[in-house]
Amino acid sequence: MVDAFCATWKLTDSQNFDEYMKALGVGFATRQVGNVTKPTVIISQEGGKVVIRTQCTFKNTEISFQLGEEFEETSIDDRNCKSVIRLDGDKLIHVQKWDGKETNCVREIKDGKMVVTLTFGDVVAVRCYEKA
């Protein structure tokens, strides 16, 4: 089912992302850049692992992982996290844990678009991507 996510995706819409970044403790200057940047996300499968590359003018990141296995990740805003990504039905669920905190990123395909729902506490942001 990961195959449905394997593509190059371009951000087309973002809702409540500034509030989400603020809740995470992201500084003002970084939030300003984050709010105007339109990242490209490339999801692929390479040798039994899933690879998610995020490219933008601010910073490029890459994570490579096995579904369901914990791995260490440095987030785009420089948090050192223990992460697990698993497939739950047609959703790719990414859980990041750091300093006793936890955030969830749920990716799903709806009408040919990738909808990403980011949750930290009671703050929810939604970002929509279309195939590039």
Swiss-Prot record:
The modification N-acetylvaline is found at residue 2. GO terms for cellular component: cell periphery; cell projection; cell-cell junction; cytosol; neuronal cell body; nucleus. InterPro entries: Calycin (IPR012674), Fatty_acid-bd (IPR000463), ILBP (IPR031259), Lipocln_cytosolic_FA-bd_dom (IPR000566). One of its GO terms (biological process) is neurogenesis. Belongs to the calycin superfamily. Fatty-acid binding protein (FABP) family. B-FABP could be involved in the transport of a so far unknown hydrophobic ligand with potential morphogenic activity during CNS development. It is required for the establishment of the radial glial fiber system in developing brain, a system that is necessary for the migration of immature neurons to establish cortical layers. Forms a beta-barrel structure that accommodates hydrophobic ligands in its interior. This is Fatty acid-binding protein, brain. The gene is Fabp7.
